Every structure is written in structure tokens, then in C-alpha cells.
């Protein structure tokens, strides 16, 4: 396949592979290459000389593979309509000024290992491939342990990202759904099993990151309780074991909680630091997230 860019043979996570677009002039025809990120790659923005550029970056260790995507009948028909429109506009122009343009979509992917002949599934949903929390992402977490200086949590999901296929079982997989168990039950059972095995991403909410005011007087025990579902934002990758998270925003904090350390009923936020159970009327302190 002819293209205007020299691709690296081996890639590793974070390695730049190619820009999003490339051009080439061949026999008086402008060829525009549109590089599409495939499995094992991701489109990331970079700053270069004050300009924002988008480039395809590897997320796996393996061999770089690029192949041209075949156009569907609808795309070919649309291109034919665009070319006829351009020809009508260039009737008055001289033949030397008319330049033909061709757009080619190139799928760029990284295959694990070094097998160049290995085939990938083109119909796989790439949204499920890389769902790792990164800086700035909003995540849903569950509190697992408390101390005077911090709250330890486990990350359940990344907001605005699809949930991964749950190992072939449940509504999100290819297996049979158990009676009385829907998608929520299947997802909860899988996350519970992952939690027991210690396979979830872990995070830390430090006392100075709980809220933006009166940081020195924050009492973690009055803001969170074990079992609470907390909406937080990723501050940094942390110490290599735990993500550093923050709830120092009005829309961040506890979204679901139960009274009496999880033994009571579901509570609802009445203000930014108080939750109430509508059944018993019991109130407990929390750092609540603004619901809307």
C-alpha cells in the first residue's frame, strides 16, 4: 500500500505512529490520507510550536499494521456527487488549473506480539478496547477504607464510556442472562467478583482534595463512609498503585449512600453536606454531589 509516511515496525504505549492526515501529489492528482485509529491505538492531541495537532498513538506493545479501508456504496455515490459539483464549479477554469483529489482511509492498528500476518476483527467495537482512566476523567468509585488523612476507593466505571463486555456472561456479553438478573445485576456481580480478586483500579481521595474550601478542617469520616458511591475526577496517575482523585467541585461527591454504614436504607442529599433517609428520617453528614 502506497502512503506518504514511514510507519514504525514496532510500537509501545505512548509512541507516536503517524499524524491524523497526510497528503501526496501523484501524476497531477492530490491524494489525501486519512489515518483512522484502530485496535491498539488512540487519537491524542499534542501541542507543537503553539499549534494543536492530532496524532495516532500506540496503546499496546506490538507490530504496527496499516491497511486501506474499502469504501461502501454510499460513500462512493457521495464522492461521485461531490466530484460532479466541483466539475460544474470549474467550468470556466483552464484545464491546467483543475486538480483531482482522492481521499483514502487508512486503518492503523497495533497487533500484540510480532506476527505481521495476524488478522484482526474489523467489526469489533473499538470503544471497548481501551477504557483506562486518565487525567481529567470523571469516574464512579466505591469507598473501601477510611483513615484520618484519606479515603481509599475502587474505580467502578469511567463516565461517558461504555461498560466493557463482562467476560461473556450477562446482558453485556454473549451468554445467557440468569432469571431476575438484568444488565445492572450482571455488571454488579462482575465488579463485585473483580473487587474480591483485587483486579479493579484503586484510587485515593486525600483530605485536602475533598473540597475547595476549609481544606485544613476537613474530617474524612464526616465526608465519606465505606460503601458510598462517589463521583470524582482523576487528578493524576498517583504513585503507580493508586490514582489520585478529587471531589473539590460542586458536581463531585457522594451520589449514593446508605444509612448506618450501609445497614440502613438509601439516603438522598438535602444540601451539600447532609443526606437524609426518607423512610426513617435519619440524617448523616456527607460531602454530597450536586444532583443537577
From Swiss-Prot:
What keywords are assigned to this protein? Cytoplasm, Exosome, Nucleus, Phosphoprotein, RNA-binding, rRNA processing
Q: Where in the cell is it found?
A: Cytoplasm; Nucleus, Nucleolus
Pfam families named among the record's database cross-references:
CSL4_N (PF21551), EXOSC1 (PF10447)
Concerning SUPFAM superfamilies, the annotation shows: Nucleic acid-binding proteins (SSF50249)
One term of GO molecular function: RNA binding
| InterPro entries cross-referenced by the UniProt entry | Csl4 (IPR039771), CSL4_N (IPR048626), EXOSC1_C (IPR019495), NA-bd_OB-fold (IPR012340)
Cite the CDD domains for this sequence: S1_CSL4
Give the start-end ranges of region Disordered: 67-98
Protein task: Non-catalytic component of the RNA exosome complex which has 3'->5' exoribonuclease activity and participates in a multitude of cellular RNA processing and degradation events. In the nucleus, the RNA exosome complex is involved in proper maturation of stable RNA species such as rRNA, snRNA and snoRNA, in the elimination of RNA processing by-products and non-coding 'pervasive' transcripts, such as antisense RNA species and cryptic unstable transcripts (CUTs), and of mRNAs with processing defects, thereby limiting or excluding their export to the cytoplasm.
Q: What is this protein called?
A: Exosome complex component CSL4
**Whose protein is this, by species?**
Saccharomyces cerevisiae (strain ATCC 204508 / S288c)
- Tell me the lineage of the source organism: Eukaryota, Fungi, Dikarya, Ascomycota, Saccharomycotina
Gene name tied to this protein: CSL4
Amino acid at each position: 500500500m502506497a502512503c506518504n509516511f514511514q510507519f514504525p515496525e514496532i510500537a509501545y504505549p505512548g509512541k507516536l505512529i503517524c499524524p491524523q492526515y497526510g497528503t501526496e501529489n501523484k501524476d497531477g492528482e492530490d491524494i489525501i490520507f486519512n489515518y483512522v485509529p484502530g485496535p491498539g491505538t488512540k487519537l491524542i492531541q499534542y501541542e507543537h510550536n503553539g499549534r494543536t495537532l492530532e496524532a495516532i498513538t500506540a496503546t499496546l506493545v506490538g507490530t504496527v499494521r496499516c491497511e486501506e479501508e474499502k469504501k461502501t456504496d454510499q460513500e462512493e455515490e457521495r464522492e461521485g456527487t461531490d466530484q460532479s459539483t466541483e466539475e460544474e464549479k470549474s467550468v470556466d477554469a483552464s484545464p491546467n488549473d483543475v486538480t483531482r483529489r482522492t481521499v483514502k482511509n487508512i486503518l492503523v492498528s497495533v497487533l500484540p506480539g510480532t506476527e505481521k500476518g495476524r488478522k484482526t476483527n474489523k467489526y469489533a467495537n473499538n470503544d471497548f478496547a481501551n477504557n483506562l482512566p486518565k487525567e481529567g476523567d470523571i469516574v464512579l468509585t466505591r469507598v473501601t477504607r477510611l483513615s484520618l488523612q484519606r479515603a481509599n476507593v475502587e474505580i467502578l466505571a469511567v463516565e461517558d464510556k461504555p461498560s466493557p463486555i463482562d467476560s461473556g456472561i450477562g446482558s453485556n456479553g454473549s451468554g445467557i442472562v440468569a432469571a431476575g438478573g438484568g444488565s445492572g445485576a450482571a455488571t454488579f456481580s462482575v465488579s463485585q467478583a473483580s473487587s474480591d480478586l483485587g483486579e479493579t483500579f484503586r484510587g485515593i481521595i486525600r483530605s485536602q482534595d475533598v473540597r475547595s474550601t476549609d481544606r485544613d478542617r476537613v474530617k474524612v469520616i464526616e465526608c465519606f463512609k465505606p460503601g458510598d458511591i462517589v463521583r470524582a475526577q482523576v487528578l493524576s496517575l498517583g504513585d503507580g498503585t493508586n490514582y489520585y482523585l478529587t471531589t473539590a467541585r460542586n458536581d463531585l461527591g457522594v451520589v449514593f449512600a446508605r444509612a448506618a454504614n450501609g445497614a440502613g436504607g438509601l439516603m438522598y442529599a438535602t444540601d451539600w453536606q447532609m443526606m437524609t433517609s426518607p423512610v426513617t428520617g435519619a440524617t448523616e453528614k456527607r460531602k454530597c454531589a450536586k444532583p443537577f
